[in-house]
Design a protein with these regions (language model features):
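Short, Asp-centered acidic motifs that coordinate Mg2+ and/or phosphate
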Residues: 10, 29
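Active-site beta-loop-alpha junctions enriched in small/polar residues
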Residues: 17, 35-37, 112
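Short, conserved, surface-exposed binding loops centered on an aromatic residue
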Residues: 2, 21-24, 85-88
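A short C-terminal boundary segment appended to hydrolase-like catalytic domains
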Residues: 43-165
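Active-site environment of divalent metal-dependent phosphoester hydrolases
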Residues: 11-24, 39-40
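Active-site-proximal segments of metal-dependent phosphoesterases and phosphodiesterases across multiple
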Residues: 1-7
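Divalent metal-coordination and catalytic microenvironments
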Residues: 15, 32, 97
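Short coil/turn connectors at secondary-structure junctions
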Residues: 26-28, 104
C-alpha cells in the first residue's frame, strides 16, 4: 500500500513460487505473486555450497566449499533430500492490464502451465494452460482474492477483473 500511496501504479511481488491474491488498492493492482513463469528445477549441473548449507546437509561428506566442485550427482542428492516440488510451483500467469484515460479498467489473467506432468524436456517451459489447469488456477486466485474484495470472472480459460467505473 505504501508504494501505491507514494505514486506507484502497479505493485508485483516476486519470490513465492505459487500464485497469491490480487488486490485493487485505490484503483491500482497489487499482485501478491504471479506464481512461476519459467522454472528450471532439477536441471542444474552445479548445486552451490550455499544450497547445502541452507538445507543443513551436514551428514554429507562434502569435499570442498568451492561450488565448481559440485556436480550433477549433487543435484540428484539434493532432489532426494528435499523431495519433489509441489505441482503448484509449476503454474503461473501472464497479466495484461487495460487502461483508459490513465485509469485501470480491466485485468486479464492468462494462465500458464510449466509442464509438471509432461516430459522432463518440457519441465519449466511456459505453455498456455489446458482448460482444466486454467480453471483450477483461476478458481484458486478468485478464492484468494475474496478477502481483498477483488472479483474475478472466468471466461474462455482467462481470468477477468473489471474495475468499477
Amino acid at each position: 500500500h505504501e508504494a501505491i500511496d507514494n505514486g506507484c501504479d502497479m505493485f508485483c511481488v516476486h519470490g513465492p513460487f505459487e500464485f497469491r491474491a490480487i488486490e485493487i488498492y485505490k484503483g491500482k493492482p497489487i499482485f501478491y505473486s504471479l506464481g512461476s513463469f519459467i522454472r528450471q528445477p532439477y536441471q542444474q549441473d552445479i548445486v552451490p555450497w550455499e544450497t547445502y548449507s541452507a538445507h543443513k546437509f551436514i551428514d554429507r561428506d562434502y569435499p570442498s566449499e568451492n561450488p565448481i566442485d559440485t556436480k550433477i550427482e549433487d543435484a540428484k542428492f539434493l532432489l532426494e533430500r528435499t523431495g519433489r516440488h509441489p505441482a503448484s510451483y509449476f503454474r503461473g500467469a501472464s497479466i495484461s492490464c487495460e487502461y483508459s484515460d490513465s485509469k485501470l479498467k480491466k485485468i486479464i489473467i492468462h494462465p500458464v502451465d510449466l509442464g509438471i506432468d509432461g516430459p522432463l524436456s518440457d519441465l519449466g517451459i511456459p505453455k498456455i494452460a489446458s482448460e482444466e489447469v486454467a480453471n483450477n488456477l483461476l478458481n484458486e486466485i478468485a478464492q484468494l482474492s475474496v478477502p481483498y474484495g477483488t472479483k474475478l470472472e472466468i471466461k474462455d480459460g482467462l481470468g477477468v477483473i473489471k474495475l468499477e467505473q
